[in-house]
Amino acid sequence: MQRKTLLSACIALALSGQGWAADITEIETTTGEKKNTNVTCPADLGKLSPEELKRLPSECSSVVEQNLMPWLVTGAATALITTLAIVELNDDDDHHRNNSPLPPTPPDDDSDDTPVPPTPGGDEIIPDDGPDDTPTPPKPIAFNNDVILDKTEKTLTIRDSVFSYTENADGTISLQDSNGRKATINLWQIDETNNTVALEGMSADGATKWQYNHNGELVITGDNTTVNNTGKTIVDGKGTTGTEIAGNNAVVNQDGELDVSGGGHGIDITGDSATVDNKGGMTVTDPDSIGIQIDGDKAVVNNDGDNAISNGGTGTQVNGDEATVNNNGSTTVDGKDSTGTEINGDKAIVNNDGDSTILDGGTGTRITGDDATANNSGNTTVDGQGSTGTEIAGNNAVVNQDGELDVSGGGHGIDITGDSATVDNKGGMTVTDPDSIGIQIDGDKAVVNNDGDNAISNGGTGTQVNGDEATVNNNGNTTVDGKDSTGTEINGDKAIVNNDGDSTILDGGTGTRITGDDATANNSGNTTVDGQGSTGTEIAGNNAVVNQDGELDVSGGGHGIDITGDSATVDNKGGMTVTDPDSIGIQIDGDKAVVNNDGDSAISNGGTGTQVNGDEATVNNNGNTTVDGKESTGTEINGDKAIVNNDGDSTILDGGTGTRITGDDATANNSGNTTVDGQGSTGTEIAGNNAVVNQDGELDVSGGGHGIDITGDSATVDNKGGMTVADADSIGIQIDGDKAVVNNDGDNAISNGGTGTQVNGDEATVNNNGNTTVDGKDSTGTEING
């Protein structure tokens, strides 16, 4: 019979104080010799006595078993096992029975000499007729499912495990291994066609039933069973099982390699509190193939060897609560529907101490149930669309990722569906390629702690949470590079993201993206954003809050902070540097926005520090602001009722604008000093009616710049800090509109062709309450056209 080697195992039944065991090493399948003998079996076997049944040839064994099988159903198993056991073990070389316990009669040696009996006197010498006749011992019978019967040595070998046997008076056979451990054979059935033998028996204490079938598979029924599989186990084919146990407290020690394919099961246990110690490594391939399956609660599986799962197979599957699986060796899972470890039940624990490599649609760990914990101490590599490192469906899941997490090709590193999930990622994370996600959680109240550094590129996403009240703590540094790449993404209300580590966002990537109301982003680390379409922190939702404690550096057309929604608040304490056209440090699209720039801001080469598009915006620039270069802007607001408080000093150079407001009822309070120099430079620029500018700090304008420039009716400027204006085209205060009011309470010094105050409009009022000095050709203190 052609077949792969199946159970390479020791059959060990350790049962409540006594049992039997033998450690088995790998052997190849052996085909025994047998003769073809025509045998006629009695028609009515049921009428034969046990003694008559014993004398039947082996060819009748299947007939005997068929006739007596109904006894098992009705509970009369004793008659069956008593009848068959002794019959089969007395099988001789040609598969006929020999009930005699004595050796068979020696064959004739073909000699013609006839022995001469001695005479009564005893004087004659009997001539020798040749060599002594020596009885030929029967050859061992080898069956194709790795069982050998040696009647000469009175031994039975199962997969290289040798037992001595004894025939009992009740027809059963007693087995004993070299360590003195015992068991009983109750049933022995030979398949003449395939030359295999099936064994069935009990443990020494009668508590456990065991079977070794024609396929070389071990099936055990009973509690407290132990099976030691020292040799290699190969299982191939649908419905094939290497070791099968039905009972509680089962123990399987798999020291040899476990190789499962074709839909078979390597180890299959049904019962609570099972333990499998798999030291020999495991290879599982093909759909429906399972290396280790346990159906029962409180199972423990230890996979110390390396595991290779492919083509839809499953390494370890537990269906029951409170399961623990320890994968201490390396695990490779390759192919769609392939799974390394699968648990269906609550309170599961999976410890992946070895490295895991998940490829082409496979799943490393899959848990379905509440209160699951996965501890990934080893490194996890996930590559390929549909591939997942750790997948949990259930509430209160916990994943501790101590090893490195590397995800590419559209795979997911950690994927959780359920509320109140927690992920502690200490090992660092690298995610690349579209659809790739390092950590994904679908559920409310998720918490993710990324303590290691994160590198996200080429369209990948580091952490994504879809649910309300999520918290993501990025304590390590984060680098996001490439269009559609995202460091952290949350879709849900009341999200909190804490970026304690530094963030570097490049070439179209996004550091943090939140879609939902009442979001908070705390950026304690420095944020660097470079490249068109790049964004450090992006929020779409009302009542957003961003606390930027670290430095904010934006260039190349990127955005540092971008919020769409009403009532947003940004507290920027760390300072801001913005350069290049289209670059914006802080942008808010929505009404009632509040921005506090407590640190210093440096804006250059066409960049914008703060831009708000919406009504009732308030921007407080408490730190110093420097704006340098054409089309560079410190603060820009497009909306009515805007308020800008420049408490720090402002320096505007070479065509830049300190504050620009487009909208009615705007107010600019310049408590700090304002210095404006260069053609096209403007300190404060407002386009709208009813504008108010309170210039409490000094105003110094030169090189053709404008200190305050308002276009609109009913504008009011209160200049308390004094004003110095020099050079042609330089204007301290310019208003284009009717009904303007200017109050210059401080002293004014105008020189070299400059103009102190200019109003172009009707019904203008200018009050110069301080001293005014005008020096030089084309210099003008106050000019009104209207």
Task: State each model region's role.
Residues M1-G786:
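Long, low-complexity, polar and repeat-rich extracellular regions
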